[in-house]
Amino acid sequence: MKRILLSTLLAATLFPASAHTHGNNPATKLEQATALTPETFRIRDPFVLVDKKKKCYYIITTAQTESRHRALRAYRSTDLEHWYDAGLVYDSSHDALACVDTEQDVWWAPDTYRYKGRYYTFVTSSAEANGIPRFTTALCSDKGPLGPYHAMHDNISQIPLTPDGVQCIDGSLFVDNDGTPWIVYTKEWNGPEVQNKVGEAWAQRLTKKLDGKVGDPIFLFRADEAPWVPGFKDGGHVVDAPFIWRDKQSGRLVMLWSSFTTGDVYAVGQLTSETGTIRGPWKHEPRPVFVNGGHQMLFHDLDGNLKMSLHYDNNDGHLRILDVEIADGILRVTTPSYSSADKSR
């Protein structure tokens, strides 16, 4: 799938590293006077972290430093409408990811979580010069959501949380009812490990510290199982951004993911676990829950309302945060201005 690193371009052009936090110093203040709004915030794969203590929200995006090393940049908001640059929160030049090449290797899809009192950003990368294909790893911050984040191993070969030697992207964190952490990820559709260019979703159990793998991965689903994903004309069924959420009211386990529906339009779909566990089996909903955008996640805002964040559309991605509800285990977009959601159902 064609990906445009808009967040990196934005950081490099509008917010040069020289004007902000250097190295691994934590970002402690808002340094951008003019707020970005959903209409002006050009970003892909936006993941919203809620800070109840400080009553604000963060989005951490990909960026790069003056020395052209991979980095992460944070944005902060108190209302989900106005986003202020909070500076760099990670600089790869200081750790095992220093070998990630700005031109050759990917740097995608940072998802940030609070887990056991620490903050972790799951990010997709690669280290082709070291023979390591695309993978997802976790960076850790002991000091708060604004970092500094750091890799949890000194050796690049120990960094991937997805299976070694397998082309994987878009890992997200899921913690099941007994406290077991999992990384839910995509075995990429154009990688050598899949059949007939059909992407797959898998899950890998992690250590309690999120710094390694435990046991063998488990298969979740294939993209061509979904009725709403016809595949590209020249072949290929995409799985992007698998994200698992437990609905507290129904107790059901739902999974959102992104792919391309009729007309090669990016969209969000849903599955439900028939056992209520990550092992499934997973049942597809026949139609997408959102069309013309994707790489979604769910969160409760500071008032307890359920929201879905994604980029809209897929060609010129901007931040979009939608009101959603889950009724009888099925997610539905309730934002009044979005009529296509109702039409798709």
Q: What positions do the PLM features span?
A:
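Sec-dependent N-terminal signal peptides
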Residues: 4-13
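C-terminal segment of classical bacterial N-terminal signal peptides
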Residues: 14-18
